[in-house]
Each structure stands twice: as C-alpha cells, then as structure tokens.
Amino acid sequence: MGSHRRYLYYSILSFLLLSCSVVLAKQDKTPFFEGTSSKNSRLTAQDKGNDTCPPCFNCMLPIFECKQFSECNSYTGRCECIEGFAGDDCSLPLCGGLSPDESGNKDRPIRAQNDTCHCDNGWGGINCDVCQEDFVCDAFMPDPSIKGTCYKNGMIVDKVFSGCNVTNEKILQILNGKIPQITFACDKPNQECNFQFWIDQLESFYCGLSDCAFEYDLEQNTSHYKCNDVQCKCVPDTVLCGAKGSIDISDFLTETIKGPGDFSCDLETRQCKFSEPSMNDLILTVFGDPYITLKCESGECVHYSEIPGYKSPSKDPTVSWQGKLVLALTAVMVLALFTFATFYISKSPLFRNGLGSSKSPIRLPDEDAVNNFLQNEDDTLATLSFENITYSVPSINSDGVEETVLNEISGIVKPGQILAIMGGSGAGKTTLLDILAMKRKTGHVSGSIKVNGISMDRKSFSKIIGFVDQDDFLLPTLTVFETVLNSALLRLPKALSFEAKKARVYKVLEELRIIDIKDRIIGNEFDRGISGGEKRRVSIACELVTSPLVLFLDEPTSGLDASNANNVIECLVRLSSDYNRTLVLSIHQPRSNIFYLFDKLVLLSKGEMVYSGNAKKVSEFLRNEGYICPDNYNIADYLIDITFEAGPQGKRRRIRNISDLEAGTDTNDIDNTIHQTTFTSSDGTTQREWAHLAAHRDEIRSLLRDEEDVEGTDGRRGATEIDLNTKLLHDKYKDSVYYAELSQEIEEVLSEGDEESNVLNGDLPTGQQSAGFLQQLSILNSRSFKNMYRNPKLLLGNYLLTILLSLFLGTLYYNVSNDISGFQNRMGLFFFILTYFGFVTFTGLSSFALERIIFIKERSNNYYSPLAYYISKIMSEVVPLRVVPPILLSLIVYPMTGLNMKDNAFFKCIGILILFNLGISLEILTIGIIFEDLNNSIILSVLVLLGSLLFSGLFINTKNITNVAFKYLKNFSVFYYAYESLLINEVKTLMLKERKYGLNIEVPGATILSTFGFVVQNLVFDIKILALFNVVFLIMGYLALKWIVVEQK
C-alpha cells in the first residue's frame, strides 16, 4: 500500500514539473470573479479512421455517463443536470444567471467553446450562479411585491453557491500563472454538495458529496460543512486528467477519494479550506500544506427574514405614544365635527327658540296682514272647468278590453265657490278628484281641464293648487306647529319674511281650531299623539297655509265627528268666499247643513254623471223627474240612495214600508218603494220610517243586493218603486235644461270676450318662487335631525351596539399575534366587522319605507325637489349612521387588538370602513327605493349581501375560479374590495412566524395574502373601486327616486 502511494506522489510531482516547463507566464494572483482572456481549447481525441456513425446519447448505455454525478432519467435516457451545467452529458457550463430574463425565459445560454462566461447584471462566478446584487433575487420570491436579498455571508440557508480561488502558494508557483479555482454548491434540504476544480476556467475534475451536515460556530463565526461520502471523477483529456503533456490522476480520484470531506470557512475573512484524508496526504507530501486553502465568495437568494440570526421584531403589546396621540386626535376631531353639525342645525328655522314652545306667547297676526297675504296683489283668480272627462283602465278578465271607470264627466267651479263630488262607494269620486288635480293615473284619461279657459301643463298647474289626501301622511315626531311651519317654509314665496310665514301658520291653526294643540306631537300607533280628527285638520292646514288658487280635498270630513266636520267645512267656506278661492272636494255623506254650503255639485253613480251643476237645484231636477226627497230627510243621504244600483242586471225590489223591515215582515210579499208622491200614513209615521231608513240604510242595501225583484201580493197602488237604474238618471240629466245650463256656463268661461265672468283679471302665478334648493336642504336637514333626536332609538341603538360589539371584539381578539393563527384571526375580525356593517344597513330599508308615502305626497304637492330630499337623507341619516360607527369601532378595536399602526394604517382602515359602509348602505337604499314592497326589498337585499359575501375572498379563492359564469362576479362584490384592502393594509408589511417541526418558520404576510388569491398591490385600486361604488349607487339611488318613486294612482 505504501509503494502504491509513493507511485502516485511521484506521478503527480512529475506532472507538475512538466507543467512548469511549458508555462510562459509568471505567477499572478487573480480574483475569482475577474474575467480571463484565455483561449485555451479542449483537446478531443478522435478516431479519424472510424467512419462508423456513433450511437445516439443514452445515459442508460454503459458507454455514456452523466457528468457532475447528475442523475440519469431511465425513461428518457437523458441526464438531469445539476444547476450550472447542460448538454447531453451535463459537461457544458451555463452562463447568464440563475434568474429568468425579463420575458420570463429560464433557458440559460451555454458557454461557447474556448471562451469565458459573460454573466448577466447582478450575477458572477465561472457558471454565473453566484448572486452579486439584491435585485436579482426578487425573481425567486413567491410574490412580485416581495423583495429578495442576496445573502453573501456564507452560512447556508437553503441552497448556496460559492466560487473560490486556490491560495496555496506552492500550487500557484508550480502552475506558473494558470489560475486554479473551485466552484462549490450545497443543497441543505437534500444534504448534498457538488465540487468542481477548474484551471483557467476549464473543468479538470468534479466531486459529489453526500450525507452532509451543516454546522455553525457562532462564537468563532465559522461554518463547517461535513460530508461523509465523497466521490470524484476526472473530465477526460483535461489538465491533470490525461491532457497532452499532463499526468492523469483519474484512478487516484476514483479509487482513493472516498471521504469524509470538510469545507470550513471563516465567515469574517472568507478564508476557507477543503480537506479530505487522501487529498490531504497528497497535498502535504507534494506541497507541504495540510489541505487546500481557498479565498471564497458565496451568494444565496433569500428573503431577509431567512437570514441566519435574523430576529423578527417582537410585537409591542401596548400602543405607542404616537398611536395614543393618533387615537386621541381622532376622537377630538369626531367630537368637534359633531358639535359643529349640532350648532349648524340649531340655526335652522325649525330649531329657533320660541317656535312652537308652549312657554312662548302666541302672537296672532293682524287681520289686515293676513288679508293682504291671502289676496294676490294682481287679484288673480282661477275658474276650473272640465269637459267630457273619461277614464278607462285595462280589464283584468278581458285581454285588450278597457273598462270605463268615468264616462264623460263635465263641470265648472268659479272663484268663491265650492264644488262637491258626491256618490256612493265606488262611484268614482276620488278618481275624478285625482284627474281634476292632474295626478298621474295608470289608465287612459281623455277630456279637457282648463283654468280660466286655458289648458295648463301638469307642472304649472301643480304650482297653483293644493291637495289634501284622504289619508293623513305626517311625520309622527314633529309637533302640529312644526308640521304646518314646515309646509309654509318650503312652499310659500321665499320673498316673504320668516315672521310673515310664521304669522300665517298661527292664523291657519286658529281658523281650524287646533291652536291649542300646536305643541303636541303628531304621534303614531306606537307613540300616542293627537287624535285622528286633529290629524285631518293638520293635513288641511298644511295646504291652507299656502293659500292655493284651487284647493282639492279628498274626503276632508272623513274621520271627524259632526262638530269638527262642520268646523272644517265652515273654514273652507270662509276661505272660498272671503278670499275668492276655488275649492273642489269629494265627500261621501255630509250633513244636510253642510250640503247646503256647497255651491256646485257633481253627482256620480258607477262612473256616470247623474247631475252636475248648481247644488241647490239638484232637488228641483229630481222633483221634475219624479224623485221627491221626503221631508226631514237628509238630502245628501237621499242623493246617495237614488244613485245606488241594485246589481249587474239592474234588478229592483219593492218594499211596502219601513216598519215591515223593522217588524221582520217577509219583504218578498210587499210592494212598496222608498220614493212616493202621496203617503197613506200620517206625517209622524212617515218621519219615523225615514229616520229608521237613514239609520239602517246599509241593511236595506244589502237586502236590495241579495233579493230578487218580487211583485207584491196585495196590489196596493199607494206604494211607489225605488228606481235604481243609473243609466236612466244619466240620460234624463243629459236631456234636461240643467245640463244645457252647465254647457252654456262652460262656454262662457272659455269665451275670451266674457268680461263679466271676472275670472281673467290677471295671469296665473305659476312662476312664483318658493324656497330655493339650499333653503329646502336646510329645512329638510333640520326636520330630519329633529325627527332623529326625538326618536333616537335607531341612532343611539346603532351607536350603543357598535360600542358593545367593539368591546366584545377587542376582548376576543385581544393583542392578536403575528403568526399564522394571528393572520387567521385578522381575517375573521375584518370579515365579521364588514358583515356587521353590511346587515345593519337594513335599517335603511324600514326607515325609507315609512318615509316613502310622505315623500310621494310632499313631492306631488311641490314641497321640495327630489334632489333636495335625497341629499338631505344622505346627510341626516346615512352619514350619522354609516360614518360615525366605523370611527367608534376603530377607536376601540385598534388599540385592544394591537392592529398595525404603521404607514397610516389606522386612518386607511377607517377610510376603507367608511367607504364600504356608505357603499353598501347606498346599495341597500337603492334597492329599497326601487322596490315599493318592504318584504321584497328585504329579500333582494339579503340575496345581494349573501352573493357579495360569497365572493369576498374568504369562502372561495377567487383566483381559482375557472367557470366563466362565476369568474368575474367578484368584480361586483363590495365586500371583496373592502375585505382585500383591509387585509392588505394590515398584513402587507407584517412578517408572520410559525413554530413547525421544531423550526421557526417566517412567512411574509404578503405571501399569505397571495395564497388566498388577494393581490397585494391592489390597495389603492381597491379604495378607488370602493369610491366608485359609492358614486354609482349614489347616482342610481337618485335616478330611482326621481323616476320610480312618483305618485301614480
């Protein structure tokens, strides 16, 4: 064995001496990364006499092998080369760099023969696999937003590449200028390394090291890579391995080098050594050195958190003084804004001291001032005439067939007169009143409506009229005085002073005898307020306060007792007669004394005009046609009775007398009628019978509707017949002189030459300016805020719930950690917050449902523009309920949970929550505006929110959705953009650590976000999209309010 070693030593020594004799250059120390201009060529032995085509490369064949100890793929017969080499047998060095180029191409160029590598910017080494700059490592990071680090300290993290210059002086002297170098790469997870020995950048031999352990001596600042198994091979026909004029150590490398191998470095000086027992013996014998000494440079692309010795900053369990200052300033700012808003609102007319206060004296206006106000300066009056008003609607049972509701109704009413529209239930009174007031109708309207003989458009007509609905739609939290004042401030000319408007309010309240309840709230079914009759008078007061030229009232006495009904009608009569106003009202069953206060009458039955003209002449007309109202019988009741129709067949029945019904007599055997010209009984009996008839009218009608027409058995001639044929009465009126008088009166009004009609004394005041837009907005805001603080349940409940929920969440997620479980907690926290704010917005549906009918009524009566109401609702309801809660929640949750306070993350979080809360509330409000039914709007809102939640990014990774039908649905989810932006704002800059398998694994928060399908760079983009959602739904809500929420009867 000793002789064998001596032989090897002598052989190597002879080779080194021979090499020294042919070297022309002198020894020179060359840095490892310095380029060389050597043009040495590899010597290749070719058998020129062999003309046979060589077999294709197949590493499975014994004549071929994979260099660098690369693995052979048994399926393809190709070598799977280690990093830095290519070619069929992995013998060709690669250049360029480890990272892909700008186009993403990872194919590295092969080094040209007899040339050196030209490395890409940021890479170095013989094979261009040692990083030099940090930026080249960005390509190896899991997300483009994460920056990589070129770690050059030499301690392996995952896979390190090193390049070394041999520094043994005797070896350098013997090579006489040729540069010996080593490339060394280790793979820590696989516990293996590879080693290449180069002379003038031409590979001579290589080694593979396995079963490696990687140790560090932190005290000495050294690293030790120990590999138990080492195997080496020569590259044929190279220096030291059979090149011409050189010795061949192939057998020595293959048979003698077995390991263990040790690669140790001083990490401060970068001085390294490579030792292996057999190789050490050779070096010691020949050169006198115990091992190969090296000067190395290494590089490994890692994330900064993976650098050995790196310690992630510990999470401060308490809020810093800067954070406390931010929280305090934010709280002060919110309080200041609230104070300013309160002060601004208190300056509104509805909030002035003394208005409507029970302690303030009531100063009624002077009579002259009121008269001057009620009477127009130009003495403009309005005569309303209408001809052949016909209204039809599509029939439910017949396709394409229209059902006539009103048929050719005509009439006229002049200033100072009251026109009453009467008839039984279903006669068409309210329909005719709506048409005369030019309300929007769903059916087809024909005929003409003129004021002073001139046709007017709906917009101009609405400015000179007032309309009192049959039902009372009033804000329940306002007082009587505030309700009427609200109408006055919004609708009276803005040129009038506030004192003049207030004086008019007091006067109207006095006229309607509700001045004593002026400080009582309206109330509703939950909060007791004024009575139903008082509400009716308040509704009338809201219209009377504007002193319209034409006032329409639908059942003004409905719900009032006899005394109050008489007071209301007398007030209307005074308004009509004293101030020459034109009044049109529908009324069902007035008292007789009220009936005789009417100037004009339109009597309807089943949509047909039975009479139209002077109210006092209706008895004369009926008497002429054989219908005589009994003495002491209410003429209004009598008119309803005679227009009552028995049924679709026009059936009639006969009644002998009222006492028969009272006594229970079988009316099928009686022949009598209500209307008779002579009476067989005494006057007292007759009076009692008619009194009984008035009290039991509905019972008699029921009998008339259900019984068959039966002829009496006694055949007495004293009884007369109840003629219920509406068509007959209609035809009789059309043929009467009264209809002719009506037609002539209408013609006179239409005639421009009629100077005595006194109805064309001035132009109609359609251009009168009421409150401007800003005035409307101020009044509506003050009204809404007053409504809010008098009924603070919704506002305070929202705030209280938000505070309690914030405390609960702060306690549950207290001091959330910076690890994977902390990331999960953050996801759950933000998702729950968004879900809470999302479903709380449902309160907007119920609040608008209560206001919808009030808005429709006030809009149709020209209180304000839809835009003023919409902006007022946003300012007075959406802002307090959707802006303040996110701020309160953030002020509590942020310090308790210890969320990220860096880079203004706190303010960004507040902004994101506010934008989301506003956006989702506007979306829900838009749905509530579009759908009139509250149940339908709630169902659709739930579906919208659930769909938005599904695509928020928590329940499904939106990047992995391949179905085209669902792939882009996240783009319509407000939750997705809010959720993504909140997570990015919180986690992007955090380093999350986790203890797994005994290792402290650190993962950038941005990496986890990318895993969940979120795009880390989208923070600003998401915020812009949230703002866009707000703008879109804000516009959609207004357009829906303007075009959908309109009065249509």
Swiss-Prot record:
Coiled coil: none annotated. The keyword Acetylation does not apply. Keywords: ATP-binding, Endoplasmic reticulum, Glycoprotein, Membrane, Nucleotide-binding, Phosphoprotein, Signal, Transmembrane, Transmembrane helix, Transport. GO terms for cellular component: cytoplasm; endoplasmic reticulum; endoplasmic reticulum membrane; fungal-type vacuole; fungal-type vacuole membrane; membrane. GO terms for molecular function: ABC-type transporter activity; ATP binding; ATP hydrolysis activity; ATPase-coupled transmembrane transporter activity. Glycans are attached at residues 50, 114, 165, 221, 935. Residues 26-324, 482-793, 850-877, 931-937, 1022-1024 are lumenal. It is found in: Endoplasmic reticulum membrane. The keyword Membrane applies. Residues 1-25 form the signal peptide. The chain crosses the membrane at residues 325-345, 464-481, 794-814, 829-849, 878-898, 910-930, 938-958, 1001-1021, 1025-1045. Residues 384-631 form the ABC transporter domain. InterPro entries: AAA+_ATPase (IPR003593), ABC2_TM (IPR013525), ABC_transporter-like_ATP-bd (IPR003439), ABC_transporter-like_CS (IPR017871), ABCG_dom (IPR043926), EGF-like_dom (IPR000742), LE_dom (IPR002049), P-loop_NTPase (IPR027417). GO terms for biological process: transmembrane transport. Disulfide bonds: none annotated. It is a multi-pass membrane protein. ATP binds at residues 423-430. Pfam families: ABC2_membrane, ABC2_membrane_7, ABC_tran. PANTHER family: ATP-BINDING CASSETTE TRANSPORTER. Present with 339 molecules/cell in log phase SD medium. Belongs to the ABC transporter superfamily. ABCG family. Eye pigment precursor importer (TC 3.A.1.204) subfamily. This is Probable ATP-dependent permease. It comes from Saccharomyces cerevisiae (strain ATCC 204508 / S288c) (Baker's yeast). The lineage of its organism: Eukaryota, Fungi, Dikarya, Ascomycota, Saccharomycotina. The gene is ADP1.
